[in-house]
């Protein structure tokens, strides 16, 4: 039995990640594809993250970085098992978000990557570009919903994309929504059909 593909959606806040993930789940109906999003706010670490994001509690930046990382590690075994059972996972945010946001707040990228090292490695990362309209819409109740900060996050994403050690697919913000939806669906289907070999380990 061939394994499933680990397909991650990344991008700035309000770039449409969740919408595109849901489009995939609706347009590729199958019992061999599942959706997972981070942070998972139902766990112990997830509830602490939710309190932080909604400004109910404050933590220093190092603790925040570790909380987000621990939240992903809580699901590392689940992800590995699902992929080995032939289940493709569509993941809304992953380690790249953690590294980009931490680096935007001043944490060394190499340090943040070391926390995530060994997580299941994505077969494909789809990065949704944000147009000026979406970026300027990044003002909200949660702590990171700030235009200036989001621009810093974008620069950190670009650094990771340029490294070339991960298969990134950048989706332009200039596409019409129906064109974008169809393009992403085709990219995901191709990734599902061409995945080979064992599950890799991220940043090892």
UniProtKB/Swiss-Prot annotation:
Keyword Electron transport belongs to the record: no
Disulfide topology: none
EC number: 2.7.4.9
Enzyme type, top EC level: transferase
GO molecular function, one term: dTMP kinase activity
Pathway: Pyrimidine metabolism; dTTP biosynthesis
A Pfam entry, by short name: Thymidylate_kin
InterPro entries: P-loop_NTPase, Thymidylate_kin-like_dom, Thymidylate_kin_CS, Thymidylate_kinase
Residues annotated as transmembrane: none
Residues annotated as binding ATP: 11-18
Keywords: ATP-binding, Kinase, Nucleotide biosynthesis, Nucleotide-binding, Transferase
GO terms under biological process: dTDP biosynthetic process; dTTP biosynthetic process; dUDP biosynthetic process
Catalytic activity of the protein: dTMP + ATP = dTDP + ADP
Family: Belongs to the thymidylate kinase family.
NCBIfam families, A to Z: DTMP_kinase
Protein name: Thymidylate kinase
Annotated source species: Ectromelia virus (strain Moscow)
Gene of this entry: TMK
């Amino acid at each position: 039995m061939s394994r499933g593909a680990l397909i991650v959606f990344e991008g700035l806040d309000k770039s449409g990640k969740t919408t595109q993930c849901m489009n995939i789940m609706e347009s590729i109906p199958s019992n061999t594809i599942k959706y997972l999003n981070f942070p998972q706010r139902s766990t112990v670490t997830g509830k602490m993250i939710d309190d932080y994001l909604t400004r109910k509690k404050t933590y220093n930046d190092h603790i925040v970085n570790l909380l987000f990382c621990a939240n992903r590690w809580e699901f590392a075994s689940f992800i590995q098992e699902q992929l080995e059972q032939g289940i493709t996972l569509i993941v809304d945010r992953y380690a790249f978000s953690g590294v980009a946001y931490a680096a935007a707040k001043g944490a060394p990228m190499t340090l943040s990557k070391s926390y995530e090292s060994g997580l299941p490695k994505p077969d494909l990362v789809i990065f949704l570009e944000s147009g000026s309209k979406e970026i300027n819409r990044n003002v909200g109740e949660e702590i990171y919903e700030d235009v200036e900060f989001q621009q810093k996050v974008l620069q950190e994403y670009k650094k990771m994309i340029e490294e070339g050690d991960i298969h990134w697919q950048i989706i332009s913000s200039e596409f019409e929504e129906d064109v974008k939806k169809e393009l992403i669906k085709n990219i995901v289907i191709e990734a599902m059909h061409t995945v080979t070999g064992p599950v890799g380990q991220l940043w090892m």
